[in-house]
């Protein structure tokens, strides 16, 4: 007598499928980012000479209420505009009952880096679609050169957000031209008010040369740039005006500072770029040669 037994042996013995939902992946990414940002951010003395200038500016704001042109102890002329120092001083005042001034000021880095990662995620989502923002964020936090520097009191941390916001504006231009022009104006303002003219010029020159390409060579792009500059001037203009009114001689000294280093070291800068962009840059080159999911 034959017996026929139906048994799904393939289904029972097969490896279980990975079934992590989008929310779970997002939660893992948030936890990883939180650990990456806050590990090593506080609990140590100021690093010298990396943090000396920023701490001097922050103390100048806290102790002397000098919000317009706080100068560092080693330099009478403010090397950087006051945006980064202002937020550092604000966090220091807010958290001073619980943390040392330098530790409390470093908490502002968490704000800048979070905003940077948000802008990178929005940029990648705009170019590649939903779900790719996390990947870009992982590439960003994997960059070796950022590990120490995001925990350092330096205005370049705020400039990262300005760059991310400006690049997001370019990616948004074709879908939302007016909104992207406002975002670009804000990004340029963050760059100028945190790190000075060089980062501002890098984005401005990029925007100028984009106008020579067929996709950007039109009247709408000219209006986009005009609105961006108008927004930018409306933000940085009041600070420049107040700086000139409060101390005209110091303002002239600041304006007449050399823009570029008199002895630039090309290979040193190239090594720095390679260090800070590893492994994000090789991965970006690999993705550039691959078709975008939006094109499929």
Language-model segments: residues:
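Membrane-interface transmembrane helices that cradle and orient dolichyl/undecaprenyl
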Residues: 125-131, 166-183, 190-191
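Transmembrane-helix motifs of polytopic, lipid-linked glycan transferases
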Residues: 107-127, 165, 288
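Short acidic/glycine- and proline-prone juxtamembrane loop motifs at membrane-interface regions
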Residues: 106, 145-159
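Transmembrane-helix signature of polytopic, membrane-embedded enzymes
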Residues: 22-32, 115, 120-142
């Amino acid at each position: 007598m034959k017996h026929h037994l139906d048994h799904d042996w393939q289904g029972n013995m097969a490896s279980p499928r990975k079934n992590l939902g989008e929310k779970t992946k997002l939660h893992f990414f948030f936890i990883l980012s939180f650990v990456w940002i806050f590990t090593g951010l506080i609990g140590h003395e100021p690093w010298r000479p990396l943090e000396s200038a920023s701490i001097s500016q922050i103390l100048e704001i806290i102790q002397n209420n000098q919000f317009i042109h706080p100068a560092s102890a080693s330099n009478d002329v403010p090397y950087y505009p006051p945006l980064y120092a202002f937020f550092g001083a604000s966090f220091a005042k807010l958290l001073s009952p619980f943390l040392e001034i330098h530790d409390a000021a470093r908490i502002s880095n968490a704000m800048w880096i979070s905003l940077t990662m948000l802008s990178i995620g929005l940029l990648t989502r705009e170019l590649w679609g939903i779900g790719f923002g996390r990947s870009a964020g992982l590439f960003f936090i994997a960059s070796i050169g950022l590990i120490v520097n995001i925990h350092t009191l330096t205005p370049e941390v705020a400039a990262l957000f300005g760059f991310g916001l400006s690049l997001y504006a370019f990616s948004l231009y074709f879908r939302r031209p007016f909104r992207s022009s406002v975002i670009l104006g804000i990004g340029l303002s963050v760059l100028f008010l945190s790190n000075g003219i060089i980062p501002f010029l890098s984005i401005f020159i990029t925007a100028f040369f984009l106008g020579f390409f067929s996709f950007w060579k039109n009247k709408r792009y000219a209006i986009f740039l005009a609105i961006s500059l108008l927004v930018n001037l409306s933000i940085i203009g009041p600070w420049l005006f107040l700086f000139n009114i409060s101390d005209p001689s110091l303002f002239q000294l600041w304006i007449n500072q050399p823009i570029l280093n008199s002895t630039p070291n090309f290979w040193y800068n190239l090594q720095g770029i390679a260090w800070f962009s590893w492994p994000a840059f090789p991965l970006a080159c690999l993705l550039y040669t691959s078709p975008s999911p939006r094109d499929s």
